[in-house]
C-alpha cells in the first residue's frame, strides 16, 4: 500500500503545481469583480444626480431613459424631419435628385409596353442593360437607337442557353468576316 500512497501523493503534488497559476488568476479575477461590484453600486447611487446635472454639462440623456424601448421599424416621421433640416439650411444635398412627376419632363422607356421611366439613352434600367449587352455582342437591332421616342421600339426576346451560345458564335463569325 505504501507504493500506492506514494504514487497518489506524487500525482496530487503535480496537479497542485499545474493548478497554482490557474488558482492565482481566479483569485485576481475575484478581486476584480469585487471592485466592479463596488463601482456598479457607486454608479447606481449617482445615477439620479447625473440625470439632473448631466444636461448642464452637455450630456445627453440616453434614448432608453427618454421613451423606453423603441419599437421595430423606421423611426417616426418627426425624427426624419429633424435630420433633413440641416441639409435644407445650407449644406449640399447628396445622392440622386428626387424623381420628377410624370408631366414634368420625365419620359417613359422607349420599349413598347414597358412604361417604366427612362434613365439613360431613353431606356429604363433593365432595357439599358440589354442595350449594352447587345452592343457588346454586336447584335444591336437597327431600331434600338439612342434617345428613341417613348414606346417606339419593339422589344426583342434574346435566346437563352445553347441557342444563346450559337447566336453569340454566329455574331462573332459575322464580326470577323465583315
From Swiss-Prot:
Stretches with biased composition (Low complexity)? 76-90
The ranges of region (Disordered) come to 67-102, 138-158
Q: What's the protein here called?
A: Vegetative protein
Q: Which organism is it from?
A: Myxococcus xanthus
Q: Which gene encodes it?
A: vegA
